[in-house]
Amino acid sequence: MNPQIYSIAVANHAEERIYERYPNGENLNTDKLVQEAYAYGKSSFHVTRTSSVFLKDIETRYENGTALLYNRYIFIFSEENVFITMYKNETVII
């Protein structure tokens, strides 16, 4: 879904993960970070083949969501533009 038409929602679980895993997460503008990750994050089409397989595996674990690499983290979004969770990236190479 186009985020310019359908805004991106942030699940409570995802917001907690930002606070836990992102440096200085409690002082961030969560909505801005999520919008930037969605707009500028790298998908499985923009990374190396090995990393692409890893991102696609994550996507299948989240009911075919979208995994985007942004600022050394992997952000996972649902098909309905809901930010579900995030992981620190230690595997994916651009």
Question: Predicted regions: what is each one?
Answer:
Residues 1-94:
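Ribonuclease/tRNase effector modules and their secretory precursors
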